Amino acid sequence: MSRRLIYVLNINRESTHKIQENEIYTYFSHCNIDHTSTELDFVVKNYDLNRRQPVTGYTALHCYLYNNYFTNDVLKILLNHGVDVTMKTSSGRMPVYILLTRCCNISHDVVIDMIDKDKNHLSHRDYSNLLLEYIKSRYMLLKEEDIDENIVSTLLDKGIDPNFKQDGYTALHYYYLCLAHVYKPGECRKPITIKKAKRIISLFIQHGANLNALDNCGNTPFHLYLSIEMCNNIHMTKMLLTFNPNFKICNNHGLTPILCYITSDYIQHDILVMLIHHYETNVGEMPIDERRIIVFEFIKTYSTRPADSITYLMNRFKNIDIYTRYEGKTLLHVACEYNNTHVIDYLIRINGDINALTDNNKHATQLIIDNKENSPYTINCLLYILRYIVDKNVIRSLVDQLPSLPIFDIKSFEKFISYCILLDDTFYNRHVRNRNSKTYRYAFSKYMSFDKYDGIITKCHKETILLKLSTVLDTTLYAVLRCHNSKKLRRYLNELKKYNNDKSFKIYSNIMNERYLNVYYKDMYVSKVYDKLFPVFTDKNCLLTLLPSEIIYEILYMLTINDLYNISYPPTKV
């Protein structure tokens, strides 16, 4: 859509009515000026373009550089009619500074013209921050504006120091921030091609830029790039690694570039692998303390493929295992504390101990409860690990803390109580004894009324009575649901399926379904693996032929569903 032209000057007025200065300033500051207009031609030929405003110190050139309708064509006309490019505003701003930090769609030609009209040719100290401010403006203000490779090259060729610092940052610090924020969701920035980014960084290095310069917080440009949450592009990161940034530099918080990435709250598996591989290939073996921090901090962070990443890290760092402790906690403690269910599954699969205590004698369940930042997920995380907990004392401790647990989802809370009543057979009786205690009743007032809580417990208790009355072969449905041994539960599979469709169980139907599916899939994958390995078991040259099939089944049942699945369907290597 064409822009509406605004005319404020009547150049045909009587000679006794001269054009006022404020009209000229308004014309250059706010009007959409056509470079072919007679008004512009009249003004540049009949008006002193270098006359300054008394307060701001603006000339016609300064005014136009702040004009939202700026065009390169009008600027060229002003430059051709003798505007002084060395005059500063009252605040000390040079015209070329305003051009590079305020104007949009500037051409390389007008930058060259303006620089060439200054006899100092950017050698004066007033221009020392010009390159830094140009790139900073594209990072902070003109986010949709491109960083012109030719302009960067010209400024460097004219002698601008690429290592000049302002507020601790160099121009490269700001450029790396631009590269990072291009991929940050919601930024709406103009894309920067990898080839162009590589050429611009190469220009800096050719002119003596320090790629590992530190800001006031001790961060190199690469530190800043990796610390931007949800921004990193694997191909851009790979390109930046070709410049071999220093991986050993620690910032003021003791973080190397890799640790900056690990603590950025968003990790891409492929980038994590790339960074570690680059370190070990170009630097050498990573110090054990850094390896430990990487693994523990990774667990606290959101990642795109957590199961793949924790498997990679545990296999890569051989001296980090399920018993390794950092700040008094095992890996499994931290995974529970930060509700990282993928990592919890993996660590338990490789024999991590869910019942191990921290150095200050806290159980994993207590760590979940104590982490108030994750309070919306507390109940769900506790529900998740209850399937692994058989210690009645731990369950009882959880029950005692029910009044203080944050309730964000009433259905999850109801399911949690049903689990507690199922696993702790003293829960209901203790609740009944305390029912009339004002202190006990008041403890529940923070998240829900006591009457509602009491109603949930009563409903769960009634269903547990029904579970105890429901027979399953030689035992009760109550005992079956309390059992965690899938091999023992196998003989009750058909009965579980029948009860799974029983509409009389409204609260415990979910737990029945979980038990049924767990046993069903375990049995299915054991059979698949047995059939797949049958040629091995029957090979006369294999010692396994000496084992009865019952023993082989016993061994297979010791594996997790995940292990059995991977044997049945080995992952394809890309």
UniProtKB/Swiss-Prot annotation:
PROSITE patterns named among the record's database cross-references: ANK_REP_REGION, ANK_REPEAT, FBOX
ANK repeats: 56-87, 135-164, 167-213, 217-249, 253-285, 327-356
Keywords: ANK repeat, Repeat
Annotated F-box domain residues: 541-574
Superkingdom as given in the UniProt entry: Viruses
One Pfam family linked to the record: Ank_3
InterPro entries: Ank_repeat_dom-contain_49, Ankyrin_rpt, Ankyrin_rpt-contain_sf, F-box_dom, PRANC_domain
PANTHER family linked: CYCLIN-DEPENDENT KINASE INHIBITOR 2C-RELATED, POLY [ADP-RIBOSE] POLYMERASE TANKYRASE
Protein name (Swiss-Prot/TrEMBL): Ankyrin repeat protein B18
Species, as recorded: Vaccinia virus (strain Ankara) (VACV)
